[in-house]
Amino acid sequence: RRRDAWAVLRESVLDRDFRTCRYCGWAKPPLHVHHVDGDPRNDALSNLMTVCPLCHACRHVGRTVSAGLGGIVETEGPRSPYLQNELDFVLRAAWDVGVFPTPSELGRAMRETGGVTELQAVGAEEVLHAVDEAARNGGTILLPAEWLFVPAGTFWEELLGKGESARCRRERR
C-alpha cells in the first residue's frame, strides 16, 4: 500500500513540476523525486521536488561517492566558470547523444576500477552549446562552483578549463 501511495504522490510531483528537473531544467526521463529536507518520511508536497539523476546524486553526494559512482572535483586557483547545474546538463546532453557511456556503465566501471576511469573529451563547441541550452531552458543558478560533483569517467578536466589546476578525489562524508 505504501508503494502504491508513493507512486501516486510521485506522479503528482512530476506533473506539478512539468516533468522537469527544478535545479537544471532537464526534461527527459528518468526523473527522480527528491525530499528537500532529507527526511524520506516527510512526504509533504512542499518537501518534494522533481530532479534529474545527476542533480539528485549531487544532493546525496556522500552516498553517491561511497557507492563508487563519482567523485568531488575541487578547483585550485580561479573558480570554474561552470556551475553544478550546467555541468549536469552538459553530462546528460552528452549521454543523450551517446558521447559517453550510460550512467550505469559508468557506475560499473567505477566499481571495477575503484577510481576514475579514462577521461573522455568532448569538443568545446558541444559543451558550450549544451550549457547555452541549459540557460535557455531555465537552468537555475544555484551555487558558485567551488566544488562540483562529477560522475566517474567524464570530461571534467575540459569543463574546468585549461588554465586551472584541478584534482578529483574520492571523499566519504
State the predicted function of each range.
Residues 2, 8, 12-14, 20-51, ...:
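Histidine-centered nuclease catalytic patch
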Residues 1-8, 57-173:
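Extended charged
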